Amino acid sequence: MRYLRPLNSCLRGIRSGSSFQPLAQSLNTRIRYSSSFAKTDMESINTTERLAGLRELMKKNKVDIYIVPSEDSHSSEYIAACDARREFISGFSGSAGCAVVTLEKAALATDGRYFNQASRQLDNNWLLLKQGLQDVPTWQEWAAEQSENGKVVGVDPTIMSASDARKLTEKIKKRGGNDLVAVEENLVDLVWGDSRPSRPKEPVKVLARKFAGKDVKTKLEDLRKELLKKKSSGLIVSMLDEIAWLFNLRGNDIPYNPVFFSYASVTSSSATLYVDSSKLSDECTAHLNENGVSVRDYSKIFGDAEVLSQSLDAEDTKVKKFLVSSRASWALKRALGGDAKVDEVRSPIGDAKSVKNETELEGMRACHVRDGAALIEYFAWLEHQLVVEKVKMDEVTAADRLEQLRSKQKNFVGLSFDTISSTGPNAAVIHYKPEPGNCSIIDPNAVYLCDSGAQYFDGTTDTTRTLHFGEPTEMEKKAYTLVLKGNIALDVAIFPKGTSGFALDVLARQFLWEEGLDYRHGTGHGVGSFLNVHEGPIGIGTRIQYSEVPLAPGNVISNEPGYYEDGSFGIRIENIIMVKEIETKHQFGEKPYLGFEHVTMVPYCRKLIDETLLTRKEKHWLNEYHADIYSKTKDFFKGDELTMSWLEREIEPL
């Protein structure tokens, strides 16, 4: 759960001499994309002129209400700067939300992670719809309410999923409104004009088998078996991480996510990658040819989809439908012929990708040890700078140092998201993003929350630790310990196969709930293997979709409960855990039982733990975990007395 910095490239410090060549500047230079709309993260901008321009275009297109989603044409959570339309029109830079603009009003809807941030960033042209709160309408409900009396609602069909378009249409119809209108030219792009960033054209690289663990031919064979089971003519793939995983390729088009703009189609006899071929090296082209994958230009997907749709009519078969992800765009589904020829499903590629193979699992273990060593060195250094050297250090300078330490680790590629380095009240902003010139000096007498991660060739990391370099208050210690207890409870959980993350969420919240406390974000998200740090379809939380996908051995997921007091402090503890089978004395109903293996190797903050709130079992678990960290990371600190001293102090048994 974090915000994506709008940069033109995401893998910023790729090691020279590796199979991936440097795609950006040195890690010693912090790169930032600066567009006409980009301002500091917590500063509002005046959107009056932009809204006026948009409303003029709405009138010309005979649209009364215009929807501006966060996503790009691939339903990406994290997007390239050229696709940050919702941010441009609203000024809100969070990674989740939807803007609804009428000829008189404008509303921005977002979830609890971003209430604080949105309140700071939206100017007085905007109404904030706090999703999930009682008596607050969803953005669909608000848009439908505005559509009464025959008003027309429009959207760019390439950036709204077919399922979202259908749900919105249903809401509008219930209000007596018209059908949702597909506006073929994006109106925000027209307002943005020449200042809109260009689309990235970064090179695509082959991911070696020693990191991928499974070759492309095997993945295609497995996928075709799934298509046969579903009696489908083929699958059209629009999710960028699914395409990268399927073809063992990695790119650099979206910040922090090693993916590239593309589509793909797979049938029983063919596989096609739709991509700008100028981005493919000779190695990529040969790799695709060897695996029976043809290449077509990215722009050809919609025309080819129409041809595929027509081919179904000519086939002498009972199989009459293509599969698309439930997150595929409305435009793509229309090109394929709509409901008559398309089934929206949970992607079989997404399901396969979420179950890591043994090579990927071993890579996740290894990269988390190296990443943990970098974090341990960072926290030891930071404490020394603040407490001993009395350095006045801001949040960005500290984050830069952490990135530098990570860059020294084997297989390092870049960050997996923009580091959340937050002191005191900033830590209560769940997706806080410090910027140079608009960040705080780290206060050693306040809570410091650091949520950070990296991309390595052998895995993706995401770790949050909350520290205190002075004397924490009793409430800070209590909150931290309650969050820690929830983190431990989830880590040690044992549950029958078929259990979902929805069912496990209560384990992490239970101790906070006993005190009448809670947090407004999910407890866990899936994590990719040198792919997106947020990966579906699994998750741990209260979202209903998490009840639909049971956890399975090989899943990699985060465990990150928290607690936040606006204007005061924030607590979050995050480990990455892997689902595995557990040997139990009994197996009721002959059903296997599952549990977790933690791979994050960073100690908890000793100073913030209230030992009186921990049980004997929790203390034992904590001591065992800290001993494991020490044994796996100590060799990284030979000759480094400062770091070794800090580590030994933090892991001293309770």
UniProtKB/Swiss-Prot annotation:
What InterPro entries does its record include?
A: Creatin/AminoP/Spt16_N, Creatinase/aminopeptidase-like, Creatinase_N, Pept_M24, Pept_M24B, Peptidase_M24_C, Peptidase_M24B_aminopep-P_CS, X-Pro_aminopeptidase_P
Please list the cofactors this protein needs. Answer: Mn(2+)
Record Gene3D superfamilies: Creatinase/methionine aminopeptidase superfamily, Creatinase/prolidase N-terminal domain
Q: Does the keyword Disulfide bond apply?
A: no
Residue ranges the record marks as coiled coil: none
PANTHER family linked to this entry: XAA-PRO AMINOPEPTIDASE 1
Origin: domain of life: Eukaryota
GO CC aspect terms:
cytoplasm
Q: What does the entry's cofactor note say about binding and number? A: Binds 2 manganese ions per subunit.
Its name, as the record gives it, is: Probable Xaa-Pro aminopeptidase P
Please describe what this protein does.
Catalyzes the removal of a penultimate prolyl residue from the N-termini of peptides.
Show the catalytic activity: Release of any N-terminal amino acid, including proline, that is linked to proline, even from a dipeptide or tripeptide
Which residues are recorded as binding Mn(2+) 2?
A: D451, D462, E574
Q: Name one GO molecular function term.
A: metalloaminopeptidase activity
Q: What is its EC number?
A: 3.4.11.9
Instruction: Report the enzyme's class at the first EC level.
Output: hydrolase
What is stated as this protein's family in its record?
Belongs to the peptidase M24B family.
Q: Where does Mn(2+) 1 bind?
A: D462, E560, E574
**A GO BP annotation:** proteolysis
> What's one Pfam family here?
Creatinase_N
Q: Keywords of this protein's UniProt record, alphabetized?
A: Aminopeptidase, Hydrolase, Manganese, Metal-binding, Metalloprotease, Protease
